[in-house]
Every structure is written in structure tokens, then in C-alpha cells.
A protein has these predicted regions:
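Mature catalytic domains of secreted/periplasmic carbohydrate-active enzymes
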Residues: 1-158
Length: 162
């Protein structure tokens, strides 16, 4: 186990959910990763990274071919979530902006297909919908038009951190 806390919190949550008769629904931010060295830079997608005065040396993205390293990493993590914790109720993907802008890089349908191959009953959710093949959407501040069923999470402030 390569976790600083030396605990697998997802496993603990999965066990607690099963014990309580609840389905495990997992959140995964596929559209932004501030720590992976090969995620998109701010020059391609503004919220992709914090706005540092100087780009940290750990950021190694130089061209779109580098993105495959991030995507392989994300797919491996999602596969782990689908195989290591028993049946899951679903996966809720977040930050859709980069996925909209670079749909050919993310190839989100391939990820959806992988999830459904491993966990056929799992629901797939992606904010306002990435490609229309989500089971439902969860708009925030606005409602998308790709998926027919949605839950609303509208904020009354100017910033989600308020």
C-alpha cells in the first residue's frame, strides 16, 4: 500500500456502504489534475493548473502526444476503482470543460465502455454530460442539454468556494 495514511479509505467506505445496504458511488475528477506531470497546461485549458508565476519543473507536458501518459494513468485508476472494491453503484466524473474542448484527447466513451464492461450495472454521470451517453447529469450553475435526466446543484453565490 503506497498511501501516506497507510489506509485504503475507499475500501473502508465500500465496506461501510455494503454494511449499511448502500451503493458505493465514486467521484473522479478526470477533467482536471493539478498534480499529474502530463495533464494539460493552462495554455490549453485555463483551469487545468493553478496559476503559478513559474511552471513547476514537475509539469512535463510539452505537446498533445504527452497527454496519453495522463490518460493511461486515469484509466488505470478508474479500472482499479471498478475492480478492487466490489460492486459499485456508479462513478461521477467531474470537470467537463477540458473534456468538451479536447474530446478527441479524452475519448470519454472508451472510459464509459471500460466501466460498463467491468461493472455492467454501474451508473455513469458527468456533470452536464460529456457526450450524451451518461446515465444522468448533475449540472452546476447551469443545466446541460445532453442527457435527459438530471439533478440540480445551483449555487446562489458568485463562487463555489464562497
Amino acid at each position: 500500500m503506497d498511501y501516506p495514511a497507510q489506509r485504503d479509505f475507499v475500501k473502508e467506505l465500500a465496506v461501510a456502504c455494503r454494511k449499511a445496504g448502500l451503493g458505493l458511488f465514486i467521484y473522479y475528477s478526470v477533467g482536471i489534475d493539478w498534480h499529474h506531470p502530463y495533464f494539460l497546461p493552462n495554455t490549453m485549458y485555463d483551469p487545468a493548473r493553478p496559476h503559478y508565476k513559474e511552471v513547476p519543473e514537475s509539469y512535463r507536458f510539452r505537446n498533445v502526444e504527452d497527454f496519453k501518459h495522463y490518460l493511461n494513468y486515469a484509466k488505470t485508476q478508474i479500472m482499479e476503482l471498478c475492480t478492487q472494491y466490489g460492486p459499485i453503484a456508479g462513478i461521477w466524473f467531474d470537470t467537463v470543460g477540458g473534456v468538451y474542448q479536447y474530446s478527441e484527447l479524452f475519448n470519454i466513451q472508451e472510459i464509459y465502455d471500460m466501466i460498463h464492461q467491468i461493472q455492467p450495472h454501474a451508473l455513469v454521470v458527468f456533470k452536464t454530460g460529456a457526450n450524451g451517453n451518461e446515465d444522468f447529469i448533475t449540472g452546476e450553475r447551469e443545466m446541460g442539454s445532453l442527457a435527459p435526466v438530471f439533478k440540480s446543484c445551483l449555487l446562489y453565490t458568485s463562487d463555489a468556494a464562497d
